[in-house]
């Protein structure tokens, strides 16, 4: 009796683990799309409204989902305070602190941090080119992952059972 109950618990837990892993994969794609949206919003603020970077971040924060809104607000606040820290370091620190509970992989966060290195110190034209490049990279990654979804979802759910 106890063995049957234990076996049922193990099967249930492994099934739920597979479903959870599948959901996390889908959530990662959604969050990469949100990063894409963030870059487009910042690009619009900088190129068309001629906003300073902290202002562009703050303005974009109101238009994005949690936890990216707080990431942008915190980054803008710290950039405004300008305590002698380079913007790229500040950006990377906020990624580590504000985006640690997301479905984004370490690689996704590192690429986003590299994008942050191109903000703030380059002229507007170079920032525009850096944003275009990062958007293209994101687009390619999202396309690849969307093609992988059916296979990965099936794999995770099968492994769970």
What positions do the PLM features span?
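Acidic, low-complexity proline/glycine-rich segments
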Residues: 1-10, 99, 105
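Juxtamembrane/interface alpha-helical elements of multi-pass membrane proteins
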Residues: 6-78
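Conserved phosphate/pyrophosphate-binding and hydrolysis machinery centered on Walker-type P-loop NTPases
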Residues: 28, 81, 124, 128
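A generic short alpha-helical patch detector that favors 3-5-residue windows
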Residues: 30, 103-107, 130
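Amphipathic alpha-helices that form helix-helix packing interfaces
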Residues: 35-38, 42, 75, 94, ...
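Glycine- and small-hydrophobic-enriched helix-loop-helix hairpins
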Residues: 50-122
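Membrane-interface, cytosolic juxtamembrane amphipathic helix immediately N-terminal to a transmembrane helix
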Residues: 118-161
């Amino acid at each position: 009796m106890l063995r049957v109950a234990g076996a049922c618990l193990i099967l249930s837990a492994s099934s739920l683990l597979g479903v959870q892993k599948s959901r996390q994969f889908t959530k990662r794609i959604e969050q990469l799309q949100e990063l894409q949206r963030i870059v487009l919003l910042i690009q619009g603020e900088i190129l068309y409204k001629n906003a300073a970077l902290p202002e562009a971040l703050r303005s974009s924060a109101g238009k994005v989902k949690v936890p990216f809104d707080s990431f942008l607000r915190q980054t803008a606040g710290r950039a405004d305070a300008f305590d002698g820290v380079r913007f790229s370091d500040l950006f990377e620190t906020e990624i580590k602190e504000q985006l640690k509970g997301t479905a984004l992989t370490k690689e996704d966060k590192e690429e986003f941090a590299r994008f942050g290195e191109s903000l703030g110190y380059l002229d507007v034209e170079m920032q525009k080119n850096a944003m275009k490049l990062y958007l293209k990279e994101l687009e390619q990654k999202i396309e690849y992952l969307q093609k992988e979804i059916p296979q990965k979802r099936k794999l995770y759910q099968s492994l769970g059972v």
